[in-house]
Structure formats: structure tokens, C-alpha cells
Amino acid sequence: INLGVFENGGNYELLISSENEKLEFANITFGDIWVFAGQSNMEFYLCGEKSGNELLNTKEGKKKSTTDKIRMINMYNIGYMGAAGEVENVPLNDWNEYWTELTPDRVSYMSAIAYYFSQGIKDRYDRNVGIISVAVGDTEINQWYPRGESFGKFTGDSGKLYNNRIYPFTKQKIKGILWYQGEADNYRTNMNAEEYSDAMAGLIDLYRQKWSSEDLPFYYVQLTRYETKDASEIREGQRIALQKVRNKKNVGMFGLLDIIGRYDQGEGCARTDIHPWQKEVVADRFLDYVGHDIYKDSEANTSGPVYQSKQKIDNTIVLTFKHKGKLKVMDKSQYADSVCEQKISASSTDTSILHEF
């Protein structure tokens, strides 16, 4: 039964009756539903990072974690038991999960990005928020594709995660999809930029088709670094995908290379941890995109600096970037393994600087 579209609000009751039966539903709320998909950095629990744990132990954190204005469906144990688990390869039409309100216990094991994002939507735009969290760690983009669907040179041949975590919600009216994935395709499938760009653009187009919305908002993260592993092919594929999407309205990508932290920070730093802790920054950048595109917030900045051109002047190369605000150059200690003042000759490579910055 489609009840149509209701204005943002809450605490409604619904009564359905017939001659022989009566059903009553209470505590109904209407708001904006966002789907959070991808792999472990999207799934990453709030209690898994230091700042998240500290927040949960404060009076203010506990207060914000108890609200009926944010509801969630957490699919972490439904339909797909980890990256290596077996699953029925047919669409899952029904699920036994239900919307739950936030409580401190539930918040601890929800997606940190989803937590910060939903709090931001609630506070900035006074909207009720529904979270559908479907991310699974260590998963490839192929697993999120409908089996047999193609885009460019890419064809999906798995369909497991799509069938069990995406398809069940395609009849649900949603506000948009937030995506953080690519690490597994960097270190395992070794996709090149062209292959991943086809897969990424195709995924966006297909999900919009499945939700019957040609401009369904879809925003995603461009990978940051992990140690010295070269993820530049996936990052470039993510960038090129923006050009291949059929309808470019309400599609966006942002980078994270500027929040890597110092090289010697250890756990939680993207230099040494594939799960960097700065999830609030990730959520803020998602918020800027949806704030600008969906909630028409003129103050929201949707992108970091985007490379435009280069020019060689004597012994200097001048790079030009497009950006809405003022640019700031980080100190070398923030992006170099070690500072090397020696000039690089034309025939040598300076190995003291981290690869593919």
C-alpha cells in the first residue's frame, strides 16, 4: 500500500481495519531516508575510533545518542555473513529487520559515518532521518552489481550483495545513496582506472534505474592512502566515473588525501591504518554535498580543489586548481614520509616522498 508522500514530522498513528481485524501502528515518523553502502570504512562502527568512544562517554554524546528523530535499519547480520560467506544468489524480497530509534547501545555499533551524517542533517536542516546501513567489509564492487548487468567493459557476475542488501529496499522511497568502497578492488581484483570507472558509473546508473529515479542523489568517497600501496588507479577510476554517468545531476565525489594525519601517528592514521578514524570529516563532506544539492544550502562547499592545468616556468611547475574557497598548502610533514631538501635530477626518483601523492 502506497500512502503517498508526507511532510517531515513525527509521532503519528496509523489504524488499518476491516470487518474481522484491526491493526494499529504507533510512533510513526516521516523524514529523509539515506542508504549507506560500500565496504568496511562505511561499515566502521562509532565505537571503533577514539573520538567516537570519547563522545559516547560524555553527557552530551549520550543525549545526542538518544533521539526519536533518527531511525535506523542496520543490516550487518542480515543476508550476507561477511565477505567470504555463502549466500543464496536470488533477490531477498523480505527482511525481518525493523526501524529502531537511537540509543547509546545501538549507536556504539552503527556506522560512524551514518551517525555523524544523520546528526548533521537533523541539526542543520531540522529533518528526521532514516538510516539504512548495508555496507560489508572487504567486498568488491562486483558483489554490489546485479548479476549479468553491464556498463562499458564491465559486467557483473556475482550479484550477492545487490540481491540481499540493495534489492530489498528498491521499493522504499529514499533521499539518496552514500558510497565508500574501492579498497578491495585495489588490493585484490587489481582493477585499472578504466575498468573501475565503468563499474562505478554503471553502478550509479543501475541503482537509479532500480529506484526509478534518473537523478537519485549518489555521492561517494575517493580513496585515501594506505601505507605505500598504490591506489591511484582506483582513485582515477572514481574520478573518471563522474564523466561517464549518464545523468550528472546530484552525483558527486570528494577526496580525503588532506586528512591523512602525520605519518608517525600509528593506529587510526591513513598512513598505517586502512581504516582511518576521521569519520566525522567524511560525514561532514557528505553533508556539504547534500546540503548544497538537496537542501539548497548556499554556504555548503561541495568539493576540494580540482586540478585544472599545469605550466612550466623556468625550473618551476605551476599547478592551477579550481576551488570555491581559499586554498591552503599543508606543511610538508603532513604529507611526506620525510622531508628531503635535495633537488631531484631529471634521471632520478626521490624515494623519500610518499608515492602517488
Where are these regions (language model features)?
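Cell-envelope and extracellular/periplasmic
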Residues: 1-357
